[in-house]
């Protein structure tokens, strides 16, 4: 399988039993590709028209999303917005978290703003995909800008006892961390990846180090052992060589 990213599709020509896609690569090269199936994703937009935003002086961006601050309040005092109406990840759990921040604010509390760079993402395909925090490329860029080093470890499910039992050994976990510092990102492809991300999300948000994670016991046989083994390997003492 080949995945092409950061390309710009210029045209799609229907040839009956196949289609021709003309696209431009990031380096400017124009390419023609024959394909059997074309799936087009147009993204999402908010339904913010005709709900009284302009009449109440509420600011929106060029795409129609409502502008809010860290407490989810708009530019108009007393009016808040959360979920798919604001320019944040369009995920149900993110909208829920935003509502919690808003409610705590209304109750007079001082909740921490959501760090959108670390929210958990899940893709319910097969095998499942999940991730939170930085990608490897983003971490490398961050390290270069801040004079830091990063370490990356990919641990497969192929030797995991639970994965073998359920017959789902394809996939891996990838941990990205600052050298001698906190975990920066967790990426999982494999069985129950969306369920396994919870531990990674906590570790990334609590800025746990790989040394912290490596000392924790993961029950056997479970898929979560792969997370622990990846952390142990990052300390320089890999279990499987």
Region roles according to the model:
Residues 107-108, 124-135, 140-241:
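Flexible, glycine-rich terminal cap/loop adjacent to redox cofactors
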Residues 82, 93-116, 144-149, 205-208:
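Internal hydrophobic alpha-helix adjacent to the cofactor/substrate pocket in enzyme cavities
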Residues 26-30:
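Glycine-centered tight beta-turn/hairpin loop motif at sheet-sheet or coil-to-beta transitions
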Residues 21-24, 163-164:
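Short beta-strand segments that buttress and anchor functional surface loops
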Residues 2, 59, 148-151:
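Conserved beta-strand segments of alpha/beta enzyme cores
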Residues 32-108:
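FAD-site-proximal beta/loop scaffold in flavoenzymes
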Residues 114-124:
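N-terminal periplasmic "start-of-domain" segments of outer-membrane beta-barrel proteins
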Residues 5-18:
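A conserved short coil-to-beta-strand element within the FAD-binding core of flavoproteins
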């Amino acid at each position: 399988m080949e995945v092409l990213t950061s390309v710009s599709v210029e045209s799609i020509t229907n040839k009956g039993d196949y289609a021709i896609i003309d696209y431009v690569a990031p380096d400017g090269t124009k390419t023609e590709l024959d394909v059997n199936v074309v799936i087009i994703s147009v993204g999402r937009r908010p339904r913010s028209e005709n709900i009284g935003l302009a009449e109440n002086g509420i600011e929106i961006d060029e795409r129609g999303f409502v502008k809010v601050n860290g407490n989810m309040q708009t530019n108009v005092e007393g009016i808040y917005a959360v979920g798919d109406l604001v320019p944040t990840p369009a995920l149900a759990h993110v909208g829920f978290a935003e509502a919690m921040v808003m409610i705590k604010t209304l109750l007079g509390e001082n909740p921490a703003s959501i760090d959108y760079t670390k929210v958990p993402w899940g893709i319910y395909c097969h095998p499942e995909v999940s991730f939170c925090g930085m990608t490897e490329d983003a971490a490398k860029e961050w390290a270069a800008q801040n004079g830091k080093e990063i370490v990356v470890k990919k641990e497969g499910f192929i030797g995991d006892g639970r994965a073998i039992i359920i017959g789902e050994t394809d996939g891996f976990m990838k941990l990205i961390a600052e050298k001698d510092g906190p975990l920066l990102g967790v990426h999982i492809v494999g069985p129950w990846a969306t369920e396994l991300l919870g531990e990674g999300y906590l570790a990334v948000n609590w800025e746990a180090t790989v040394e912290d994670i490596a000392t924790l016991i993961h029950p056997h046989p479970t898929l979560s052992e792969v997370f622990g083994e990846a952390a142990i390997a990052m300390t320089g003492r890999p279990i499987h060589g």
